[in-house]
A protein has these predicted regions:
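A short helix-loop-beta-strand connector motif used in the catalytic cores of GNAT acetyltransferases and
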Residues: 41-54, 150-153
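Conserved acetyl-CoA-binding loop-helix of GNAT-fold acetyltransferases
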Residues: 82, 88-101, 125
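Conserved beta-strand-loop-alpha-helix junction that forms the acyl-donor binding cleft
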Residues: 110-120, 136-141
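Conserved acetyl-CoA-binding loop of GNAT-fold acetyltransferases
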Residues: 124-133
Length: 164
């Protein structure tokens, strides 16, 4: 079931993210790939910046994690990962819907690699729309703390909805 993750789940978050992120290897620009994909210090910084993780646990193992972050007047969906063995079984959808229920803003954004069509399609399936390149650049620089090279090679999707 879905639950809010705590410091006790830190290693589990890292395990899911780094296990699933292997799919990016050879697809995202090689200068952006690193192993582990998300080092522990980077995850600490994400949590300190306000990303709250939620996870799905089955048989005492986390199979999916996803983060949510409110920044000023928008909500960001961050670090959405489902173990490969559990993909296309509704876990990502259920986590996303749970986070959208928590979001209190009228605009929700998700960023991902341009070279990850599976991730783009996932968000589009749930009503998100790709923003223009100019808007993407502005949004990534305003709401995310990522290198310029990642800005160049990413996309942003937006979900407009009624504020809570």
């Amino acid at each position: 079931m879905i639950r809010k993750l705590t410091n006790a789940d830190f290693q589990s978050i890292l395990n899911v993210v780094n296990n699933v992120a292997i799919a990016y290897k050879g697809k995202i620009p090689s200068d952006m790939w690193k192993e582990p994909y998300m080092p522990a210090q980077e995850l600490k910084e994400e949590i300190q910046s306000g990303v709250q993780f939620y996870g799905w646990k089955e048989n005492n193992v986390f199979i999916a994690v996803m983060g949510i972050q409110t920044v000023n007047d928008v909500t960001l969906i961050r670090h959405a990962y489902v173990l490969t063995s559990h993909q296309r079984k509704g876990f990502g959808e259920k986590l996303l819907k749970h986070l959208l229920r928590l979001a209190k803003t009228s605009k929700v954004y998700a960023g991902t690699w341009e070279a990850a069509p599976w991730a783009i399609k996932f968000y589009q399936k749930h009503g998100f729309k790709l923003v223009s390149t100019q808007e993407k650049n502005n949004l990534l620089k305003k709401y995310w703390n990522i290198p310029e090279r990642q800005v160049e090679t990413s996309v942003v999707l937006e979900l407009k909805r009624q504020p809570k």
